[in-house]
């Protein structure tokens, strides 16, 4: 079965004989599409590992320049999640042990662990934004966080698209909703007045 390619992983682990689903937005100016191009799941193009390697080796166009990932200048918890990306360790268990998450994020993570899809978009968005703001890895440069989330979401195509957009393609780091909105609007705050600050990212 074909796998959704994670652009943050680069050529590491890429196998020529396997088939991958690739987001054409990752190869703007390199991959040529036509009216006859077949899109899998409405988002991806199927290609062999050999062709994907060739695309990665192809000269990149000078314009437009790819978006530069800009992280906010604030302290974050240095946690390597490579073992979670490989499936050797549970992301939920590692985060519970290494990060002091607020109740809203702990509950959201538990809910997503059971079922990442099914009216769960808001929870995925808030959880992804929270981790993007509080977790870093000086060794992997956030690639392990992306891989861990993809494994956590069971490589679901929609979830993969959301993660890659938020953590790779977006120019700015989105913040999760503030605590007031979490409580009154999205109803994701299970225990008010138990955290410091006005946003979940104040707690890690």
UniProtKB/Swiss-Prot annotation:
It comes from the Viruses. GO terms for biological process: viral genome replication; viral transcription. Pfam families: Baculo_LEF-2 (PF03041). Keywords: Transcription, Transcription regulation. InterPro entries: Lef-2. The keyword Transcription regulation applies. Belongs to the baculoviridae LEF-2 family. Required for late and very late gene expression. Specifically required for expression from the vp39 and polh promoters. This is Late expression factor 2. It comes from Orgyia pseudotsugata multicapsid polyhedrosis virus (OpMNPV).
């Amino acid at each position: 079965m074909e796998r959704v390619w994670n652009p943050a992983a680069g050529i590491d682990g890429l196998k020529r004989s396997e088939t991958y689903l690739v987001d054409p937005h990752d190869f703007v100016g390199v991959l040529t599409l036509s009216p006859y191009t077949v899109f899998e799941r409405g988002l991806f193009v199927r290609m062999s590992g050999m062709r994907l390697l060739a695309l990665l080796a192809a000269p990149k166009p000078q314009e437009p320049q790819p978006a530069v990932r800009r992280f906010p200048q604030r302290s974050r918890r240095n946690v390597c999640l490579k073992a979670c990306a490989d499936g050797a360790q549970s992301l939920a268990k590692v985060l519970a042990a290494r990060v002091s998450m607020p109740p809203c994020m702990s509950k959201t993570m538990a809910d997503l662990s059971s079922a990442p899809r099914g009216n769960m978009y808001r929870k995925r968005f808030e959880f992804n934004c929270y981790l993007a703001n509080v977790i870093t890895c000086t060794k992997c440069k956030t690639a392990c966080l992306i891989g861990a989330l993809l494994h956590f979401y069971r490589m679901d195509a929609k979830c993969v698209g959301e993660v890659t957009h938020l953590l790779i393609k977006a120019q700015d780091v989105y913040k999760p909703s503030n605590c007031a909105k979490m409580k009154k609007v999205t109803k994701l705050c299970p225990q008010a007045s138990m955290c410091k600050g006005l946003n979940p990212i104040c707690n890690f």
